[in-house]
From Swiss-Prot:
It catalyses: acetaldehyde + NAD(+) + CoA = acetyl-CoA + NADH + H(+). The gene is xylQ. GO terms for biological process: catabolic process. This is Acetaldehyde dehydrogenase. It comes from Sphingobium yanoikuyae. Belongs to the acetaldehyde dehydrogenase family. Its EC number is 1.2.1.10. It comes from the Bacteria.
C-alpha cells in the first residue's frame, strides 16, 4: 500500500517515543524527518542512527530539507506556544498537522471516540495524556446515559513530566476539561493533574468520576469494560485498576460539588492505570505512551483517508 511521508517536530521524550513507534511499522505512514532545536538532542541522534533525516533548526530547518515537499503530515510534539507558529507555516505549505500539544487549534481527536475525520480538517489536536486516558471512559458512560458532570484526576510520575509538560500545566487542565465536554459528552468537565514524585516511579493512574441520572449500573459497567478493551488494542497497558464503583445520592442526601452545586443521581467512579509499552520511554511513562500511540493512530487515519481520496 502507498504510504504518506511524515515528520516529527520535537525531539524530546514524546517525539522520540513516537519516532520509535512509527519506525516499528505503519501501514500508512513513513517517517521522513525528525526536527529539534538542540543539536546534541538524544532524539535527533537516534533518528540519524536509524537513517531518518534530521535538523536542529526547528520548523525553518524542516522546510529546507530535501524531503519536505513529499511530506504530507507533521506531528508537533513541542509546546502549545510554539505550535501556533508551526501550524501557520505548515498550513501555508499544505501539510496536515497532528498536534500533540494542548494548543487545541484544530478539533480534538481521541481514537476510540472520534470517527471519520472531515476531509476539510487540516489540524487535529490530541488533547492531553490525561484526556486520552480518561475521555474514552466518560464517552463510555455517555453512550449509556447523559453525563451531567465529569471530573478526572490524572496522576503521573514526575520523572515522566519533561519541561514541555511542566510548561503546559495550565493548558493541560483547560484543554482536558474542554475535551471532556466536547468529545466525552459531559455537560460539564473538570480536570486535575498531579505530578507524583514517588520513588520508584509510579505508573500513570487515572480516576474518573461521572454524575448521571439513576440508570442501570450493569449497562454502565459493560460499556466501560468494552471501551477499555477498545483502547487496549493500541495501548496494551491500559487497564482497570479495580471494579467500577457506584454511589447513589437521593434528595435527602445530595452530593455537594464546589462550583457545580447539589447533585441527585448516580455517581460512577472508574480507576485506571496505564503502563507504557517501553518502546523508548520507561514503562512507568504510560501517560506519554498513550499520547504517542493515540497520535500514531490519528495520523494513520488521516493518511488513510487522504490516500483513499487520491486513489478514488
Amino acid at each position: 500500500m502507498t504510504k504518506m511521508k511524515c515528520a516529527i517536530i520535537g525531539s524530546g521524550n514524546i517525539g522520540t517515543d513516537l519516532m520509535i513507534k512509527l519506525l516499528k511499522g505503519s501501514d500508512t505512514l513513513e517517517l521522513a524527518a525528525v526536527v529539534g532545536i538542540d543539536p546534541a538532542s538524544e532524539g535527533l541522534a537516534m533518528a540519524r542512527e536509524r537513517g531518518v533525516a534530521t535538523t536542529h533548526e526547528g520548523i525553518e530547518g524542516l522546510r529546507k530539507l530535501p524531503a519536505y515537499p513529499e511530506i504530507g503530515i507533521a506531528f508537533d510534539a513541542t509546546s502549545a506556544y510554539a505550535h501556533k507558529e508551526h501550524d501557520a507555516a505548515l498550513q501555508a505549505d499544505g501539510k496536515l498537522v497532528v498536534d500533540l500539544t494542548p494548543a487545541a487549534i484544530g478539533p480534538f481527536f481521541v481514537p476510540p471516540v472520534g470517527g471519520v475525520l472531515d476531509s476539510e480538517i487540516r489540524n487535529v489536536n490530541m488533547v492531553t495524556c490525561g484526556g486520552q486516558a480518561t475521555i474514552p471512559i466518560v464517552a463510555a458512560v455517555s453512550r449509556v446515559t447523559p453525563v451531567h458532570y465529569a471530573e478526572i484526576v490524572a496522576s503521573v510520575s514526575s520523572r515522566s513530566a519533561g519541561p514541555g509538560t511542566r510548561a503546559n500545566i495550565d493548558e493541560f487542565t483547560r484543554t482536558t476539561a474542554q475535551a471532556i465536554e466536547i468529545v466525552g459528552g459531559a455537560g460539564r468537565g473538570r480536570a486535575i493533574i498531579i505530578l507524583n514524585p514517588a520513588e520508584p516511579p509510579m505508573i500513570m493512574r487515572d480516576t474518573i468520576f461521572t454524575l448521571t441520572d439513576q440508570v442501570d449500573e450493569d449497562a454502565i459497567r459493560a460499556s466501560v469494560k468494552e471501551m477499555v478493551e477498545t483502547v487496549q488494542a493500541y495501548v496494551p497497558g491500559y487497564r482497570l485498576k479495580q471494579e467500577v464503583q457506584f454511589e447513589r445520592f437521593g434528595s435527602n442526601r445530595p452530593l455537594k460539588i464546589p462550583g457545580y452545586g447539589e447533585f441527585v443521581g448516580l455517581k460512577t467512579s472508574v480507576f485506571l492505570e496505564v503502563e507504557g509499552a517501553g518502546d523508548y520511554l520507561p514503562k512507568y511513562s504510560g501517560n506519554l505512551d498513550i499520547m504517542t500511540a493515540a497520535a500514531k493512530a490519528a495520523g494513520e487515519r488521516l493518511a488513510q483517508q487522504r490516500l483513499e481520496k487520491v486513489a478514488a
